[in-house]
Amino acid sequence: YKRCHIKGGHCFPKEKLICIPPSSDIGKMDCPWKRKCCKKRS
């Protein structure tokens, strides 16, 4: 998991990652707003 950066009011991932809702991956939020988390694209 890597940090995301806020842009345009949304959380966008760095490199080849995607941001998903916390509910999809509880406990692994790693964004500034703590509203979404980054997870590697499957």
Swiss-Prot record:
Listed GO MF terms: potassium channel regulator activity; toxin activity
N-terminal signal peptide: none
Compartment(s) where it occurs, according to its Swiss-Prot or TrEMBL record: Secreted
Cysteines paired by S-S bonds: C4-C37, C11-C31, C19-C38
Stored InterPro entries: Myo_ane_neurotoxin_sf (IPR023355), Myotoxin (IPR000881)
Biological process per Gene Ontology, one example term: venom-mediated myocyte killing in another organism
Tissues showing expression: Expressed by the venom gland.
One Pfam family, short name: Myotoxins
Keywords: Antimicrobial, Disulfide bond, Ion channel impairing toxin, Myotoxin, Neurotoxin, Potassium channel impairing toxin, Secreted, Toxin, Voltage-gated potassium channel impairing toxin
Gene Ontology cellular component list: extracellular region
Quaternary data: Monomer.
Stated role: Cationic peptide that possesses multiple functions. It acts as a cell-penetrating peptide (CPP), and as a potent voltage-gated potassium channel (Kv) inhibitor. It exhibits antimicrobial activities, and hind limb paralysis. It also induces potent blockade of neuromuscular transmission in young chicken biventer cervicis preparation and potent myotoxic effect. In vivo, induces myonecrosis, upon intramuscular or subcutaneous injections into mice.
Family recorded in the similarity comment: Belongs to the crotamine-myotoxin family.
Name of this chain's protein: Crotamine-IV-2
Organism, as annotated: Crotalus durissus cumanensis (South American rattlesnake)
